[in-house]
Amino acid sequence: MNVKVYNLDGSEKGAIELPSVFETEYRPDVIKRAVISSLTARLQPKGSDPLAGYRTSAKSIGKGHGKARVRRTAQGAGAFVPQAVGGRRAHPPKVEKILFERINRKERLKALASAIAASANSEIVAARGHKIEGVPSLPLVVNAEFESLVKTKEVLSVFKALKLEADLERAKDGIKIKAGRAKLRGRKYKKPRSVLVVVGDACDAVAASRNLAGVDVITANDLSAIHIAPGTMAGRLTLWTENAIEKLKERF
């Protein structure tokens, strides 16, 4: 299957043959497993001190005193039990708990291939919430000269020429302050995902693109399901460079 390649000004340059990965069957169930596996891989097992709340000389006075049979200190204050100040926790976190959802290597690659194919389906991309009115084609492939851009304003001009500005505005306007304790823990804002830029190798365009609201940049070799299907939802609006397409041909 061939797809058009666009210059930085939005004009057509020619065509490029897509790898067969863009024809993979859409499997949202496999994609979800792969993304969850990537998310849970970040978690660190944790547990409480086995002796937490147990370091006390408190003893129970037994029955027949008209009071609860909890362990008490010499002053009569309850201790040791979960409802007492300084007592143990009823169900503390266990280091033995399995936090990481494991996934087979072939299944993970199948999920990535399926997510890549979904990014070329206009119905799936639109259903995810992206603004694709006026976008020339999907998948959207741009000239390799894009990787040499240094300034963010240069990248923005390319996005405008390719009719991606509406989706950038959607992401910018969708930034909201979260409710709850997240504001105090370094994750104050909820930020929608916009365009994913996939380049061939590390280049100047990486730093130039990532400063735009909702835009992420990744190399073709580092691309995984969590990038192209964030939140387990496939169909992210993706901009590919010619070099990235060639790297995909080598990878799949």
Swiss-Prot record:
PROSITE patterns in the record: RIBOSOMAL_L1E (PS00939)
InterPro entries assigned: Ribosomal_uL4 (IPR002136), Ribosomal_uL4_dom_sf (IPR023574), Ribosomal_uL4_euk/arc_CS (IPR013000), Ribosomal_uL4_euk/arch (IPR045240), Ribosomall_uL4-arc (IPR019970)
Alphabetized UniProt keyword annotations: Ribonucleoprotein, Ribosomal protein, RNA-binding, rRNA-binding
Disulfide bonds: none
One Pfam family matching this protein: Ribosomal_L4
GO biological process, one term: translation
GO MF, one example: structural constituent of ribosome
Domain of life (superkingdom): Archaea
Gene Ontology CC: ribonucleoprotein complex; ribosome
Function description: One of the primary rRNA binding proteins, this protein initially binds near the 5'-end of the 23S rRNA. It is important during the early stages of 50S assembly. It makes multiple contacts with different domains of the 23S rRNA in the assembled 50S subunit and ribosome.
HAMAP family per record: Ribosomal_uL4_A
Family membership noted in the UniProt record: Belongs to the universal ribosomal protein uL4 family.
UniProt-listed PANTHER family: 60S RIBOSOMAL PROTEIN L4
Record protein name field: Large ribosomal subunit protein uL4
The organism's taxonomic lineage, starting at the top: Archaea, Methanobacteriati, Methanobacteriota, Methanomada group, Methanococci
Gene (name only): rpl4
